[in-house]
Amino acid sequence: MEKLFNGSEYNQKVIFDHPSGLFVLFFTEMWERFSYYGMRAILVLFLTSSIMNEGWGWERADALELYALYTGLVYLTPLIGGILADKYFGYRNATVMGALIMALGHGSMALEYFSDSFFFLGIALLIIGNGLFKPNISSIVGQLYKDDDIRKDGAYTIFYMGINCGAFLGILLCGYLGEKVGWHWGFGLAGIFMFFGMLQFYFAQTIFGDVGLKPQKKVNDSNIEKTSSWPTSVEWDRISVILVFSAATIFFWWAFEQAGGSMTIFAGDYTERNLSGDSSLIFKTVNTIITIVPMVIITYVLFKLFQNIFKKYFLSNFFLGTSFVIIWGIVIWMINNEFSQEATEIPASWFSVLNSLFIIIFAPIFSKIWASKYNPSGPIKFAIGLILLGLGFAFLSYGSMSIPFGAKTASVSIFWLVFAYLFHTLGELCVSPVGLSYVSKLAPVRLVGLMFGFWLLSSAIANSLGGLTGSYICLLYTSDAADEGLGVDLGGRRI
């Protein structure tokens, strides 16, 4: 009987019409993004927080410059990681090594309380580990399917949901622990779940069969010449499309990635986050709903996976199940802690949750549209994404008009930030999953890891530019900058 999917017989067992192996990758990526976005959500806040609050007391511009360096390199190293996996390690080994190195990196950052050196060592390990992990787990997703399988687009949408489920939980919980309990608790929690994600993947990887093994295991006498040849003219055309699309996305992510930098500072210093009375109760109720509902849905997916592969891959599922028990415990503690207090202060990192929340809500809708007769072309989707991104910044710009120039703090309504995240997310849904699918479809099989590396290279450039732009915004918007003569005088107001 012919297999529906590549991989072992257990990978033929379906969940929502997709192979079980996809959901092994779903949860592995979910925990990796939990750790990445959880740490990123508190990075700038930690650096700019006062020493009295156990932060480092850095200037905003300096913190955003480090943020730019980190986020840029974290997306640059996948280019090298993709090459190493294509030629030497194989996608699965690279994924495991990257996950382990990142777990060590997060653990090192949690020790910053004892020495600053641990913090910078952790940053370096995260950059290296991400380079091995990020392009190669994405490569495995596409190879689970036959070349002509129309479900591949849907697979990347599901995978993208995993990314955002992890980001949602990571920002919510690492951010809460970091701001409310202690920064090292937030960093440490990120490391714990990166380690769980690595163990879950390692003990279930045979479900992929030959997919993602070392390159030499896939080479035989009949195809040595083919796999070692220079790309054909048709392959060069496909590679060119990937490179052009990757370059175009730089402009989108350049603006979008203000979320982890200048928009986080805006949330912390310029919005009204202290709530009491009815407004406090409403926020706590909404926060509880948006936390519990996604957790219930993700837990349901977990049980579906257990039904298919629990006996065969017991250790993998044991670690996965344990991680969910811990997560549920932290969620219940957080909700109880909030309702035990009359007033509440919304964590500045909480607003970053909105991006992931909106993706979880709207991704299924967009997936249905892309599968219908109303599916626009790639360039049209990209244009729509840019327009929606611009609308988000228009809302934010209008809402911040009341802030006096040079002000260190303000109390702008949080709804302007909510609208900004909404439109940014809708724009992201038009650009990112489409790009991942394009790379998977067009890249030559032997260069899939490298092409995903180039795709992520565009994110590296955009993240660096975004962080640097944020640092300039902070510099130009302070009264110190105005006093030093920075900016251009327009009618008595310096910009």
Describe each PLM feature range.
Residues 80-98:
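Conserved MFS/SLC helix-loop-helix module at the cytosolic interface between two early adjacent transmembrane helices
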Residues 100-114, 388-406:
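C-terminal ends and interior cores of transmembrane alpha-helices
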Residues 477-483, 495:
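Conserved small/polar residues in nucleotide/adenosyl-binding loops
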Residues 118-133, 408-428:
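Hydrophobic core of transmembrane alpha-helices in multi-pass small-molecule transporters
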Residues 154-171, 178, 456-466:
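Glycine-rich segments within core transmembrane alpha-helices of 12-TM secondary carriers
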Residues 133-146, 430-443:
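Intracellular juxtamembrane helix-capping segments at the cytosolic ends
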Residues 1-24, 147, 175-343, 366, ...:
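Intracellular loop-helix junctions on the cytosolic face of multi-pass helical membrane proteins
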Residues 68-83, 357-365:
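Central cavity-lining transmembrane alpha-helices of secondary-active solute carriers
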